[in-house]
């Protein structure tokens, strides 16, 4: 096992490295297909680890003000038929209109979170924040760079807050 740890580090397989002792013990206890069991479990753990890290990265990148699920709002029925993949892949817009307290922000965050869970890159802006960043970019002559960074996202949420 000592030989494996540096190799796992070198390959950047942090999830495997973390769970190697536990999985080796489990494989020894079960004394089944030995190496096959160990390798299969290590690969499963690494996949789970990378998926989790990717989700956390996309959540940080999105800068959502809070985490809201669509199922947590009474207005969820309004958007339950929306397939966020189709909306994004077909470059469609969704506009949420309603009075104060009608859960527009909650629904927008819920849709953004659903997109993040499906591995899309999302960015949440308040209208004021976006306008400020655009003006700042114009003032310092880096509008093109700013727009290029915005284009990297699959979904942009602009909230009125």
Where are these regions (language model features)?
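Walker A/P-loop nucleotide-binding motif
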Residues: 91-107
């Amino acid at each position: 096992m000592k030989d494996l740890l540096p190799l796992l580090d070198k390959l950047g397989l942090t999830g495997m490295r973390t769970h190697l002792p536990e999985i080796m013990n489990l494989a020894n206890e079960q004394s089944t297909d030995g190496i096959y069991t160990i390798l299969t479990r290590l690969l499963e753990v690494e996949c789970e680890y990378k998926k989790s890290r990717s989700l956390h990265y996309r959540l940080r990148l999105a800068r959502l003000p809070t985490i809201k699920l669509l199922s947590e709002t009474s207005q969820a029925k309004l958007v339950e038929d929306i397939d966020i993949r189709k909306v994004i892949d077909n470059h469609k817009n969704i506009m949420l209109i309603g009075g104060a307290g009608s859960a527009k922000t909650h629904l927008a965050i819920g849709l953004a979170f659903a997109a993040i869970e499906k591995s899309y890159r999302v960015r949440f802006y308040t209208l004021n924040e976006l306008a400020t960043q655009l003006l700042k970019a114009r003032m310092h002559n880096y509008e093109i760079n700013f727009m290029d960074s915005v284009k990297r996202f699959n979904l942009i949420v602009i909230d009125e807050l």
